[in-house]
């Protein structure tokens, strides 16, 4: 076995071992883990016939959280249409203070929809950052979290049923592996291939 392959295997093994040790030690010193803000969904659909949609935010902790929200063009997922034009949707209010044990509502508003395609869905990113308040107490850590959710703009009158769109996916084997083609106007999320 060449030395560089052995080095890679050992490095990979040592990295896994170091990660396992770090995880175990983190659990031993963690003491107490508290949840923060829960967002009412994992992906959101904005129908074109609506002026706005609402998203529920729930503070499950004993401290206040500052929530910062914004909508961007997609950068994290394949299939997103690259564009330099700002998203024609707005998160309001952009800053929300959630007191302990309360809920708040984030509204997504359309600013102009005539620049979006009418023959297919458009993908956006809804970015929600949660920042804890208060002082850090002895031997504890506070972590700000940024979650990014898929937000789909769905024009009116698209053909077919979005819940059945996955049945129209076309799988083709080629020299590089398998190619998947989606002939529908809907984005389809695959859980497992």
Residue ranges and their predicted role:
Residues 5-21:
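Bacterial N-terminal signal peptides that target proteins for export
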Residues 35-60, 160-173, 177:
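Beta-sheet-dominated interaction scaffolds and their linkers
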Residues 81-114:
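Intrinsically disordered, low-complexity Pro/Gly/Ser/Thr-rich segments with frequent PxxP/GP/PP motifs
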Residues 53-59, 108, 124-129, 178-182:
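Buried hydrophobic-core signal for structured, non-transmembrane domains
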Residues 113-156:
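Terminal connector regions
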Residues 61-83, 185-193:
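Short acidic, flexible loop segments centered on an aromatic residue
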């Amino acid at each position: 076995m060449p030395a560089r392959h052995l080095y890679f295997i050992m490095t990979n093994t040592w990295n896994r071992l170091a990660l396992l040790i770090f995880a175990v030690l983190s659990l031993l010193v963690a003491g107490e883990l508290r949840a923060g803000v829960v967002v009412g969904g994992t992906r959101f659909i904005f129908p074109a016939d609506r002026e706005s949609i609402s998203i529920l935010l729930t503070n499950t902790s004993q401290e206040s959280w500052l929530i910062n929200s914004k909508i961007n063009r997609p950068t994290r997922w394949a299939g997103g249409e690259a564009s330099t034009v700002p998203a024609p949707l707005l998160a309001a209010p952009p800053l929300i203070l959630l007191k302990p044990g309360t809920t708040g509502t984030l509204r997504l508003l359309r600013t102009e929809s005539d620049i979006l395609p009418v023959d297919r869905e458009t993908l956006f990113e809804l970015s929600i950052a949660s920042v804890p308040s208060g002082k850090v107490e002895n031997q504890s850590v506070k972590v700000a979290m940024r979650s990014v959710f898929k937000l789909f703009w769905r024009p009116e009158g698209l053909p077919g049923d979005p819940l059945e769109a996955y049945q129209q996916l076309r799988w083709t084997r080629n020299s590089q592996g398998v190619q998947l083609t989606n002939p529908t106007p809907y984005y389809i999320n695959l859980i497992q291939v």
